Regions:
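Alpha-helical solenoid scaffolds in large eukaryotic transport, assembly, and signaling factors
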Residues: 1-90, 132, 137
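Helix-rich interaction surfaces within compact, conserved domain-sized segments
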Residues: 72-137
Length: 138
């Protein structure tokens, strides 16, 4: 999962947010970082992958909840909610893979947020696919 995340979001190699920052600011929907969400969110996902043994940390719960919230966002011009609108198709698929990774690899119960996030990101992927298909036919 780590490599898929790095391939889809190359900016994570720049490490614009430290692991310490992420641990001290676990809720990126409340304590919005000074970097764009397209940079911040993948770093939070990477933190979860690299720190899977620290599952008691709030970063896991808040990252899953944030992804659920971002999938439901309706307005691309709202900077603190624009994550899904900034994602390309590969990144959307990678977010879905991350959520599936959470479902299979994490032992704590993140329901109902996790199931909702998976369902909502599946819809994002479907909407993007149908948008692309309709614009090709135009």
């Amino acid at each position: 999962m780590r490599e898929e995340l790095r391939n889809a979001f190359p900016s994570i190699d720049e490490k614009t947010l430290s692991d310490e920052y992420i641990k001290e600011h676990p809720d990126l929907t409340w304590d919005i970082p000074d970097v764009t969400l397209i940079q911040a969110v993948p770093l939070y996902m990477l933190w979860c992958i690299e720190n899977a043994t620290e599952e008691g940390e709030l970063v896991f719960d808040y990252t899953i909840s944030a992804l659920n919230k971002y999938a439901r966002a309706k307005e691309p011009r709202i900077e603190w909610q624009d994550f899904k609108f900034s994602c390309n198709q590969e990144q959307i698929i990678t977010v879905r893979q991350f959520l599936q990774w959470c479902k299979t690899e994490l032992t704590q119960d993140y329901e109902p947020s996790l199931s909702r996030a998976i369902k909502n990101w599946q819809t994002v992927n479907t909407l993007r696919s149908s948008d692309a298909a309709s614009s090709v036919g135009s």
